[in-house]
């Protein structure tokens, strides 16, 4: 059996899809389905079982027997960078992750988890997987950073793979449930469908992000499992591109429209990453040779999926 937490979420459901594609359907999905609309992310995929996230961690703590587990992909978390309830974040993103990590270590189960480029904060260079380059700007980023630090403490003694991925700006299919946290491509497409022009913040021509297609993210996770990879790695394309490039790809797909600029919101000032670019040196050194879709390639594929 394979366990995927956050399996109804964007990255989790794409990992389920990637597992199905290699013939694995013996998957236990763990999630919080309070937002029932997320069910659509797995409706075309095959899993063996579902468990509520709180029931699951209670079973872990109680020492219940789950049978033979080949891997745990821990994608479940509060992913809202605008969330400032620190107690909630630390419970969901830190304490929960620690319990699951120790369960995997105790049973020698390969453990793969979602970290985030938010751990780097507002820096404009050196996105390298080392403590000296990490200074998160928000509570979400801090919760992810703290778990990375915890993993660094236990890694030297681990007898089974423990692997974290600092996801950069992930976009693509199965994110419609995320609301304001969905990718800019998703929101721009919705604006176009309403007959509006795609809207970007003023100054966005200078905002560069490492936009990585979600199917590429899932591929790296599967590769890490199949190759027993341990460590903490950046997961982006290694090339920053502009929000303008995303908007242009959406316009090109629809064959109409032009970019409109809107004021930059006050609540994001000083808490906004204006540049991100994954340094892939460590991932490549670990042996990953796969390519990553460009914004033009990934957005075109995503638009076709959204507007199918």
From Swiss-Prot:
InterPro entries named in the record: Epimerase_deHydtase (IPR001509), Heptose_epim (IPR011912), NAD(P)-bd_dom_sf (IPR036291)
Positions that bind substrate: 169, 180, 187, 201-204, 209, 272
Binding site for NADP(+): 10-11, 31-32, 38, 53, 75-79, 92, 144, 170, 178
EC number of the protein: 5.1.3.20
Gene Ontology molecular function: ADP-glyceromanno-heptose 6-epimerase activity; NADP binding
Cofactor: NADP(+)
Function: Catalyzes the interconversion between ADP-D-glycero-beta-D-manno-heptose and ADP-L-glycero-beta-D-manno-heptose via an epimerization at carbon 6 of the heptose.
Family: Belongs to the NAD(P)-dependent epimerase/dehydratase family. HldD subfamily.
PANTHER family named in the record: ADP-L-GLYCERO-D-MANNO-HEPTOSE-6-EPIMERASE, NUCLEOSIDE-DIPHOSPHATE-SUGAR EPIMERASE
Protein name: ADP-L-glycero-D-manno-heptose-6-epimerase
Species whose genome carries this gene: Actinobacillus pleuropneumoniae serotype 7 (strain AP76)
Gene: hldD
């Amino acid at each position: 059996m394979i366990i995927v937490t956050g399996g109804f979420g964007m990255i989790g459901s794409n990992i389920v899809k990637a597992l199905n594609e290699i013939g694995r359907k013996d998957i236990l999905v763990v999630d919080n389905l309070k937002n029932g609309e997320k069910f659509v992310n797995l409706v075309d995929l095959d899993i063996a079982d579902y468990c509520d996230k709180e029931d699951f961690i209670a079973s872990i703590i109680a020492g219940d027997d789950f049978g033979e587990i080949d891997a745990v992909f821990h994608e479940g978390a509060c992913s809202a960078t605008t969330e400032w309830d620190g107690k909630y974040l630390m419970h969901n993103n830190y304490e929960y992750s620690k319990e699951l990590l120790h369960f995997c270590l105790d049973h020698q189960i390969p453990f793969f988890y979602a970290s985030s480029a938010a751990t780097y904060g507002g820096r404009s260079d050196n996105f390298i997987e080392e403590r000296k380059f990490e200074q998160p700007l928000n509570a979400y980023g801090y919760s992810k950073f703290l778990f990375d630090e915890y993993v660094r403490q236990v890694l030297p003694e681990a007898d089974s793979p423990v692997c974290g991925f600092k996801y950069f700006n992930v976009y693509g299919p199965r994110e419609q449930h995320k609301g304001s946290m969905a990718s800019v491509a998703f929101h721009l497409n919705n604006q176009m469908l309403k007959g509006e022009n795609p809207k970007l913040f003023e100054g966005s021509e200078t905002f560069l992000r490492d936009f990585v297609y979600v199917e590429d993210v899932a591929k790296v996770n599967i590769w890490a499992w199949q190759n027993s990879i341990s460590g903490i790695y950046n997961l982006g394309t290694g090339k920053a591109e502009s929000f303008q490039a995303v908007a242009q790809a959406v316009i090109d797909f629809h064959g109409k429209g032009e970019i409109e600029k809107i004021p930059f919101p006050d609540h994001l000032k000083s808490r906004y990453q204006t540049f991100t670019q994954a340094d892939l040196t460590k991932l490549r050194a670990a042996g990953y040779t796969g390519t990553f879709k460009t914004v033009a390639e990934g957005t075109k594929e995503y638009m076709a999926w959204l507007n199918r």
